[in-house]
Design a protein with these regions (language model features):
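Channel- or pocket-lining gating/hinge segments that regulate access to a cavity or pore
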Residues: 229-232
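Buried hydrophobic positions in well-ordered alpha/beta secondary-structure cores of metabolic enzymes
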Residues: 46, 161, 222-224
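Feature captures the catalytic cores and cofactor-binding loops of soluble hydro-lyases/lyases
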Residues: 57-65, 69-220, 234-283, 287-308
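Positively charged n-region of N-terminal signal peptides that target proteins for export
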Residues: 1-5
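Boundary at the C-terminal end of the N-terminal hydrophobic targeting segment
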Residues: 17-21
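Bacterial N-terminal signal peptides
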Residues: 7-15
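Short acidic, Pro/Gly- and aromatic-enriched capping/linker segments at domain boundaries
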Residues: 22-42, 53-57
Length: 308
């Protein structure tokens, strides 16, 4: 019995020490364990692979609809506003790659660099998150709001980001070379400021870790909706239902607005629970619409469970 306990203790100690090893990024299995709600396809690094089709449809969803849906699901800390935006009239959606930056601490920075060297990572550590980006990814970094001497990228790294992801960045921090970044066709960024300085006294603490972006908690593989008013980070398992729900609400609103303009119904009739006659009218109106955002099959499946 005593021998068995010793063996068990040694196993526990070994497991603990293994878990405490410095990692630049979690393993795919660790990312899967971090995002258990996602049941679909995953990328090679373990992140949820939200579909490109839903990412495209998400572009047409309002921040308010996305925010409201998530709050109703109990996710009340997924929005951050007050950004400086490179192209404020453009929308960006994508799958999140996270990076955590911290104030420089030489001993830990040395451990991260040694680990990265062993993994054949090259260049400065602020380029490492860029190397893992794939098409459709958005680079999201917490650099603790540092503006002066906190510029995570300039136009060189901006070009590399766009070449990898065809998207842009969301930084709780700053960038430099703003004119050069503006010249990258298709690139966009939501940042907290610009500064001509270069990055100093900062270190990369990890890639694809849970991070904080202002008021929001963000996990690798979340889906981001970034617009003029701010950014919403969506757990991937809710994306499809959020998009369908929001598209349906927009159709319902469009129908209501049209019927109010026509004088067919009063505001009181539209704003309260609909009667069977209004529901029937709405379904007929739906069937007359061209270019619906969802397929007929998706709409039929959604409406089976719809509580009017």
């Amino acid at each position: 019995m005593k021998k068995s306990r010793c063996v068990l203790l040694l196993i526990c100690i070994a497991s603990f020490l293994h878990a405490q090893q410095v990692q630049v990024t979690p393993t795919p299995d660790q990312i899967k364990a971090m995002t258990p709600g996602w049941k679909g396809e995953r990328l090679a690094d373990g992140r949820p692979k939200a579909s490109d089709r839903l990412l495209e449809r998400l572009r047409n969803i309002s921040l308010e609809e996305a925010w409201g849906y998530l709050r109703n699901k109990g996710y009340q800390n997924q929005f951050e506003g007050d950004w400086t935006i490179i192209r404020p009239d453009s929308v960006m959606t994508g799958r999140v790659v996270t990076a955590q930056y911290m104030p420089m601490r030489p001993d830990y920075d040395s451990l991260i660099k040694a680990k990265g060297k062993g993994e054949k990572r090259i260049g400065n550590t602020n380029s490492w998150p860029i190397d893992v980006l794939q098409n459709g990814d958005v680079y999201v970094a917490d650099s603790y709001g540092k503006i002066v001497d906190g510029t995570l990228i300039g136009d060189n790294l901006g070009n590399a980001i766009y070449a990898h992801s065809h998207r842009g960045v969301i930084f709780y921090g700053s960038v430099r070379d703003i004119e050069g970044l503006e010249d990258i066709n298709g690139f966009n960024g939501w940042v907290k400021g610009y500064d001509p300085s270069y990055i100093q006294q900062m270190m990369l603490a990890g890639i694809n870790l849970p991070i904080r972006i202002g008021r929001a908690t963000v996990l690798p593989g979340d889906v981001v909706l970034a617009k003029k008013g701010g950014v919403v980070f969506i757990p991937a398992q809710y994306l499809e239902d959020l998009v369908l729900n929001s598209e349906f609400v927009e159709l319902r609103d469009a129908f209501g607005h049209q019927r109010l303009r026509e004088g067919k119904y009063t505001p009181g009739q539209i704003d309260q629970q609909w009667t069977d006659d209004i529901k029937k009218d709405f379904l007929q109106w739906i069937n007359s619409q061209k270019n619906l955002p969802m397929t007929k099959e998706e709409l039929d499946a959604y409406m089976k469970d719809r509580n009017w």
